[in-house]
């Protein structure tokens, strides 16, 4: 009798197949590591794909310098424990201009420090394929993106000029200067991610678990007071509104642009139970998603992941 795979094992097998395909097809792949839960799952799958050997490609963090401090500590610990070949890139032009999310706004900050920073790094190291942890259930522009997402020589995405993907057959042919973004987790849901993290014992950033944290409510979003830099951009009236609440994060990005959610979920089973009952998007707290109508698709057209 043929054993039947659970849906998580089917997703795992599909993702491992995609990762191995890219490693075999492309000359210089890289795995982007944003330190979040999806990156944690993708990295775990990649290590499984090539176990007991080491990853045949580096991992890269495009650093905006505005991530949560706990994210940086977690990244450094994972690199040391797993022996990862980590590349960290910060856009030097953005640093020279003093780009930050407070003075320049979320759209400018994201474009310079994330999109342009990513394009710089891909060009600098000549990567022809880059793994990312995006999923189709996250956001509508990602829902129509292929597993192999083709980009032109300027790293731009044209949703009308993508190749068909039949079953598990992927066309990796690219011209000189072109590249692909690869999404092994395309068919996973947020609930799948949490269930897999629980079953596999994958370490994640503690910010995903509820705890008492200092936050301020700005435009309906709970922003965590992560370091002293945010205080420089708050008025005395705003500082007086800082309070401690029991919160956690469903998604992690630059801390001034990422909202927390009120929650009492302090364990993985409690988070999974919360996911079964929630009726809101995990990206509701991402300020960059609300810059304008269709902003995520426009960012992706310009080279954003």
Curated annotation (Swiss-Prot):
**Which positions, given as ranges, span the membrane?**
none
Give the record's keywords alphabetically. Answer: ATP-binding, Nucleotide-binding, Nucleotidyltransferase, Transferase
- InterPro entries recorded for this chain? PAPS_reduct_dom, Rossmann-like_a/b/a_fold, SO4_adenylTrfase_ssu, Sulfate_adenylyltrnsfr_sub2
Give the protein's biological function. With CysN forms the ATP sulfurylase (ATPS) that catalyzes the adenylation of sulfate producing adenosine 5'-phosphosulfate (APS) and diphosphate, the first enzymatic step in sulfur assimilation pathway. APS synthesis involves the formation of a high-energy phosphoric-sulfuric acid anhydride bond driven by GTP hydrolysis by CysN coupled to ATP hydrolysis by CysD.
Example of a GO biological process term: sulfate assimilation
Question: What pathway does this protein act in?
Answer: Sulfur metabolism; hydrogen sulfide biosynthesis; sulfite from sulfate: step 1/3
The record describes its quaternary structure and partners as: Heterodimer composed of CysD, the smaller subunit, and CysNC.
Q: Does the keyword Thylakoid apply?
A: no
PANTHER family to which the protein is assigned, alphabetical: SULFATE ADENYLYLTRANSFERASE SUBUNIT 2
Q: Which SUPFAM superfamilies match?
A: Adenine nucleotide alpha hydrolases-like
What Gene Ontology molecular function terms does this protein carry? Answer: ATP binding; sulfate adenylyltransferase (ATP) activity
Q: Which family does it belong to?
A: Belongs to the PAPS reductase family. CysD subfamily.
Catalyzed chemical reaction(s): sulfate + ATP + H(+) = adenosine 5'-phosphosulfate + diphosphate
E.C. number: 2.7.7.4
**Protein name (record):** Sulfate adenylyltransferase subunit 2
Transferase listed as a keyword: yes
A Pfam family that this protein carries is PAPS_reduct
């Amino acid at each position: 009798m043929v054993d039947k795979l659970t849906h998580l094992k089917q997703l795992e097998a599909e993702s491992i197949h995609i990762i191995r395909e890219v490693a075999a097809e492309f000359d210089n792949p890289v795995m982007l590591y944003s330190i979040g839960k999806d990156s944690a799952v993708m990295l775990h799958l990649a290590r499984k794909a090539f176990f007991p050997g080491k990853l045949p490609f580096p991992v890269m963090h495009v650093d905006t310098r505005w991530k949560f401090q706990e994210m940086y500590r977690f990244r450094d610990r994972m690199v040391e424990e797993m022996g990862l070949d980590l590349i960290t890139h910060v856009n030097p032009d953005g640093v020279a201009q003093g780009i930050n999310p407070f003075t320049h706004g979320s759209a400018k900050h994201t474009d310079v420090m994330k999109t342009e920073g990513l394009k710089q790094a891909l060009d600098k190291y000549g990567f022809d394929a880059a793994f990312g942890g995006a999923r189709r259930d996250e956001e509508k522009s990602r829902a129509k993106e292929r597993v192999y997402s083709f980009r032109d020589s300027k790293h731009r995405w044209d949703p009308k000029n993508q190749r068909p993907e039949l079953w598990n057959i992927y066309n990796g042919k690219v011209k000189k200067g072109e590249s692909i973004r690869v999404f092994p987790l395309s068919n996973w849901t947020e609930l799948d991610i949490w269930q897999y993290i629980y079953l596999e014992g994958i370490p994640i950033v503690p910010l995903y678990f509820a705890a008492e944290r200092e936050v301020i409510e700005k435009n309906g979003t709970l922003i965590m007071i992560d370091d002293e830099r945010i205080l420089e951009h708050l008025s005395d009236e705003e500082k007086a509104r800082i309070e401690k609440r029991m919160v956690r994060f469903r998604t992690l990005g630059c801390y001034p642009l990422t909202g927390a959610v009120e929650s009492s979920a302090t364990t993985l089973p409690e988070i999974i139970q919360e996911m079964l009952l929630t009726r809101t998007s995990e990206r509701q707290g991402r300020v960059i998603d609300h810059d304008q109508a269709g902003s995520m698709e426009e960012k992706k057209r310009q080279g954003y992941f």
